[in-house]
Amino acid sequence: MFDESNIIVGLEIGTSKVCAVVGEQSADGALNVIGLGQSRSRGVRKGEIADAPMVEEDVRNAIVEAEQMADVEIRNVYLGVTGAHIRGFNNRGVHPVVSADREISDDDVQDVVKNAKAINLPNENTVVHAIRQHFFVDGQDGVTNPVGMLGSRLEVDVHVVHGHTNRLQNAIRLVKGLQLEVDEIVFNGLASSLALLSGEQKELGALVIDIGGGTTDYVVYSDGVIKHTGVLAVGGDHVSNDLAYGLKVPLSRAEKLKLEHGSALVDEAMKGRTLTLTNELGLPLKTINVEHLQRIMSLRLEEIFQLVEQDLAQAGLSDYLRAGVFLCGGGARVPQIAKLAEPILQMSVSLGQTNSVSGLKSALDQPEFVTAIGLARFGSFKNRKREGKSSFPERIKKTIGTILRR
């Protein structure tokens, strides 16, 4: 039996699956994955809850499976969130230093970050993250920790991630209905980036693209910090829908064809090859052209990368990603997907590998579990920052900035 005070759980309620990852944090802060639970997701559409009772059952099944594998009782989770309502932008906060000796204190840092978060969001939205980028002291830029410096004007740049309050609360309430506490909600794209990227990759500049069932989340790092985030309401399920429509087959058969014969690029060896589908559900025998199948997939996946590239170009970030692009999520399993993405994004593209996490290879080696692992990793950083801190405000002051620079 494990020491449950060191147990951290990441819970992803996705469009295609619900996944719970149990991690044990060692004394040196390292995270070891000791449990994994998953169930098919039946009540989520484009990353958002559409049938709460059904989702509740799926979450319960995933939690129970994770508990049994890890031999622990799960009480708290870090909950991943996504959806087209999630938005991100950069903002600057300003705070005058009024102490007699002009020395910048922790309170000054807390106040300037608070000012950066005081933005005019739509009434129905709430801040999910305010991620510190860089501080400025009397105009001096590139300051990572201003505490103890002398100055009269403190500024901070932050990346703000926000979402629709009710949609976020729907997920939180559902989890709490299962007698679980939500330690914190975390943007799925952020979680995935924490699982994959090293500190050096963040400094060089990197793009993480998480292709899920109903959404594609992405995060851009440059100079060690997050500069941009985005969510597309397009994912792997849309590929299956396209196949069902284009090939005139049931959705379940389209999904199977995608997994067994799919490719992001048309395989030259498949040209002219056909598949004869067996009789199913009383439907007549059907012949499928494999080249046509792969071309349908290629067009949809191409669209996803084009939309990401257009957003990066508009944000002026395309030239700052020297470490390249890292793919994860179930959609990253499609053969040839990196080869498809490279000419569109005009940089190197590879399948992401979990970084600085040990444990179950069945979880660590699969791109579809990256987000849930990242949620647990987010929690492990939070735990490390709590150690030795005397009060809640003190515990949370620098957590996000520290996490994102690791």
What residues fall within each predicted segment?
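Short glycine/threonine-rich loop-to-helix capping motif typified by GTGT followed
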Residues: 198-200, 330-344
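Hydrophobic, well-ordered secondary-structure elements that form the walls
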Residues: 308, 327, 375
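Glycine-rich beta-strand-to-loop/alpha-helix junction loops that act as flexible
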Residues: 79-84, 212, 323-333
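Short, glycine/acidic-enriched loop or turn micro-motifs at the edges of active sites
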Residues: 15, 213-214, 220
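A general structural motif
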Residues: 300-309
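Conserved structured catalytic cores and adjacent interaction surfaces
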Residues: 207, 219, 224-227, 231, ...
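Nucleotide/phosphate-binding catalytic cleft detector across ATP-hydrolyzing
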Residues: 1-17, 21-208, 225-226, 236, ...
